């Protein structure tokens, strides 16, 4: 039975895990790392790089290196969050035909789901390489506070990557699974998850295989990226004061600043001070300029103090919704790379009145939880019951633009809820049902998930027709809405059409593009491997010919030289053809056989001569000079006596 993998699709880094017996195992990628940067780059020659290779070239190719794409997934272009993000990244964020936020690289537009799919493909390949078999099913994690559009877009990304997404699971819930799988006694825990781009807080009751989420809260635009940008802004402003040059106008310098900020942030988690040193960051008429600055932990903490404080209100709201006090929380589990920051740990300690639990790896625990959930779905992990909640209230817009809730936030999912509505005018034959998600009292202030028209209502006075609207939330937290005209008995099963999002046709096209790209990537990799093998063979053949060319006939020597030249030509073209290189590699190997044979025979002859010489030396050495003493015979002995 094929394995189901667990993937933590992160803002900054992603991680893949699989059940190995009773334990979740994190799989190392091709570069030997346990996490993979969530970055995709497009080079000048059309090559697509994912993960560490993309990160390595980001400084020289900032406009076509896409990172923190998770912050855009499921968002519209006009969303204030998107507009804020536009000013923070060097790449282009553009408006798609459906109003969604897309990104652009080398003049081509991509949806965030497409870019996320490229990262998921990398995780899929990592798992396949380890398992030695095809992987087609996965459990993917999302921030607990993701809305329906963001969850649907994540599921679309999985489909584009060629994965059947069995379940979308909330990140704090996944972390709780990994933390509490072996815990038998009942506990109330809080999972404080501050990652690269999002913040979640979940309160759970766990014990004896049951994981029940009591409440969840968070901020989908608060994480390590914001901490990095604070430091970038500070470095740029200090440099401007000293040199009078604004580095924020230079995308290449900005990318170098971002990398330096991330490195400094990490170093300050374990040391009190760090030095940022960026030579040749820019230049003016007087010559090149260098940025050198010492940064203390205290200064960094003061720069990001308000960001850390922004996590407190969601924590208090989650505790209130769960009906527990901070003192009643038995354990606070830290998740996400940012929780390594001492100031964050100190804030959590002050808020909950206890030392947070640091026994899990904050970068890997979410992927491990996803793998455990995959094991549950596959039947490999027994006696585990997971009860999650919907993070935001769901409802429809009613008369006067009021948001009428059908399903309150923190309702256990899956769930189904119906409510009867009616018409606002006499003889109204159609109603538009606008579905929203959020906590504000007016529908316009919440996230519009979609709308649909229910037509064919028989003429009647206002308030008479009875229209039953049913909300159905599945275990992934994804919403379906249906409507039924109770007067006529006609039922309308309506699949909600998101106000943005990808259509089925677009997803299908992207799936085909991804498959084509995977094939192109495979061919490119085969080309590189064939080229490496060919260059190695050319080098060894030239060396052998130079040293032993006199051992073969002129005809054979010429054949080898021609084969080397042909293989060199095949390798040196801009778009090497793997099949052509392989064929010419085989030709060179065949014609070189006579040279190899001649070298072997010469070695055999030399070895035979050496053996004969050694034997001759040994036979000469067998003559031994001996000391002797003369022994007189019996008569001589008698006479001398």
UniProtKB/Swiss-Prot annotation:
Question: Which molecular-function annotations from GO does this UniProt entry contain?
Answer: ATP binding; ATP-dependent protein folding chaperone; unfolded protein binding
Return the annotated region ranges for Disordered: 514-554, 604-641
Which family does the record claim for this protein? Belongs to the heat shock protein 70 family.
Quote the Pfam families the UniProt record gives.
HSP70
List the induction conditions. Answer: By stress conditions e.g. heat shock.
Bias (Basic and acidic residues) ranges: 514-529, 540-554, 608-621
Q: Which domain of life is it from?
A: Bacteria
Supply the InterPro entries for this chain. ATPase_NBD, Chaperone_DnaK, Heat_shock_70_CS, HSP70_C_sf, HSP70_peptide-bd_sf, Hsp_70_fam
Keyword Transport set for record: no
Q: Report what the protein is called.
A: Chaperone protein DnaK
PANTHER family named among the record's database cross-references: HEAT SHOCK PROTEIN 70KDA
| UniProt keyword annotations, A-Z | ATP-binding, Chaperone, Nucleotide-binding, Phosphoprotein, Stress response
Q: Which residues carry this modification: Phosphothreonine?
A: 198
